[in-house]
């Protein structure tokens, strides 16, 4: 609430906030954190084999369910597709993203999307995504001057943007 008002320049006593409970019971939305290695540009090549092994294990636990793997880059998506070698994995590029998404949502098989670009504007409701894997925490790009300026002005802004991308 404080962050919202400060970003928009609104006084808190001039607006109302409505808090709604989640429609999903907490036991239906567990979060498991399993760090496997640094996914920074410097270390990603040494972490990718460990990531592939971790993803294989998660896929085995969810063998009859559809899901999505948020890859953060085409490099990671392509690596996982090549090294896991499962017909369940659906990867896309910029030209066929919508078709692959359509096939995943409407198909009967328990496919899993490999995507660096399905964090906004995509509704994987119902059985279209029973699990998600986030390969790298989606921090905003620090090379962007506006992002850096906001981060320096408001210490809470950078982690807030990161968590908003995840949820």
Model-predicted segments: where are they?
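A contiguous, basic/glycine-rich beta-loop/short-helix subdomain that forms a polymer-engagement track
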Residues: 1-30, 94-97, 109-116
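Phosphate- and divalent-cation-binding pockets in alpha/beta enzyme and binding domains
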Residues: 3, 76-80, 123
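Beta-sheet entry/capping signal
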Residues: 14-17, 31, 66-68, 87-88, ...
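Short secondary-structure boundary/capping segments
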Residues: 2-12, 83-87, 128-132, 146-151
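Conserved interdomain hinge at the start of the Helicase C-terminal
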Residues: 33-72
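Well-ordered alpha-helical segments embedded in enzymatic catalytic cores
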Residues: 50-57, 79, 99-103, 117
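Conserved helicase motor "Helicase C" RecA-like lobe of SF1/SF2 P-loop NTPases
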Residues: 67-98
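Conserved RecA-like P-loop NTPase helicase motor core
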Residues: 23, 35-46, 94-167
